[in-house]
Regions:
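Cytoplasmic-side transmembrane-helix entry/capping segments in multi-pass membrane proteins
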Residues: 10-14, 69-78, 125-138, 185-195, ...
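C-terminal-most transmembrane helix of multi-pass membrane proteins
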Residues: 41, 45, 254-304
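Hydrophobic/aromatic residues within transmembrane alpha-helices
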Residues: 30, 40, 44, 93-95, ...
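Glycine-/small-residue-enriched transmembrane alpha-helix faces in small-molecule transporters
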Residues: 1-43, 151-180, 200-205, 269, ...
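Hydrophobic transmembrane alpha-helices of multi-pass small-molecule transport proteins
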Residues: 52, 128-147, 283-303
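Specific transmembrane alpha-helical segments of multi-pass solute transporters/efflux pumps
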Residues: 19, 24, 61-104, 142, ...
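Helix-helix packing/entry segments at the starts of transmembrane helices
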Residues: 17, 43, 102-109, 181-199, ...
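Transmembrane alpha-helices of multi-pass small-molecule transport proteins
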Residues: 33-86, 113-117, 135, 169-174, ...
Length: 304
């Protein structure tokens, strides 16, 4: 039973990582074509909202979402803003500072954050996962060392790391807080819809800032943001949250679910190089990517 659940969690996580890779590739594409990162972030959630409303509404399950929000509006708006707003805004901004494969490789810091968030929810840190955490951190250092050395201190590389570190903490934190708040009352799609609705004030403010700073987005950026909304904000997020829902009561399996996002590295590297002509990683960076993937595999093994 548990082995079958582990396989299901692993399969859902890897599938979600393939769809999440679209985010990194298209965010970089929008950046290279002159699109403002603020609109890339805002439009993803603006477009995903009506899609989710239709998905939940067709099943007649909207009322439980509104009822849950009315009972705990403060918690809903806070953790939705943390889990979606403070996750995706810095992650999108980070695409300004390097190729898509670098951004997605650094995003594996989520695995590290996920392990150390357990005590906040009354669960122990999975000791078997600590070795994987150390390996992933080593990979991150190797990945950025060449960038820093070749850019006289690597200010942009450090900014990129800082932005992704923020996203790596806020995403699992917001997700887990909302799982605790909702319990079994809402399914994954309902929870994602509720979080999208409650993060809208954040996106409205950010959109006003974007409009004042750079004007409205281009048609090309708008279309690409729509694709990101469908593939990443809806499909990938639902798959990932379903995996974490299955693992919610087992800290080892929860770390496994969150660890599968490392599959994004392979999908994004291939897409970035083939579609965007991103520069290939240097020798040390290849080693760093390999070390990060090895850390993911160690984390999966620790969860068995």
């Amino acid at each position: 039973m548990e082995r079958g659940r582990t396989k299901e969690i692993l399969g859902l996580g890897i599938l979600s990582s393939m769809f999440f890779a679209v985010t990194f590739i298209l965010n970089r594409s929008m950046n290279l074509s002159g699109g403002f990162w603020v609109w890339s972030a805002v439009l993803r959630y603006v477009f995903s909202l009506p899609i989710l409303l239709v998905m939940v509404g067709m099943r007649g399950k909207l009322k439980p979402v509104w009822a849950s929000i009315r009972r705990s509006p403060g918690a809903w708006f806070l953790w939705s803003t943390v889990g979606f707003g403070l996750f995706y805004a810095p992650l999108t901004w980070a695409s300004d500072f390097g190729p898509s494969w670098m951004t997605v490789s650094l995003w594996q810091l989520t695995i590290v954050a996920g392990v150390f968030l357990n005590p906040l929810f009354g669960k122990p840190v999975p000791m078997k996962s600590l070795g994987a955490v150390a390996v992933i951190l080593l990979g991150v250092v190797l990945l950025q060392s060449q960038e820093i050395a070749s850019n006289g201190g690597g200010r942009e590389a450090l900014i990129c790391v800082g932005l992704i570190a923020i996203a790596a903490v806020t995403y699992p934190l917001g997700n887990r807080k909302m799982m605790v708040l909702c319990g079994e009352e809402l399914d994954t799609t309902q929870r994602v819809l509720g979080m999208t609705v409650c993060s809208m004030p954040f996106w409205l403010v950010l959109g006003c800032i974007g409009g004042a700073a750079r004007g409205l987005p281009s048609t090309a950026q708008t279309v690409q943001a729509l694709v990101v909304a469908v593939f990443s904000a809806v499909i990938a997020t639902l798959l990932f949250f379903q995996a974490t829902n299955l693992a919610r009561n087992d800290p080892r399996q929860l770390s496994l679910a969150e660890g599968t996002i490392a599959g994004e590295i392979i999908f994004t590297l291939l897409g970035g190089v083939l579609l965007l002509h991103d520069p290939l990683p240097g020798a040390v960076q290849w080693v760093g990517i390999g070390v990060i993937i090895f850390g993911m595999l160690l984390n999966c093994r620790a969860a068995r």
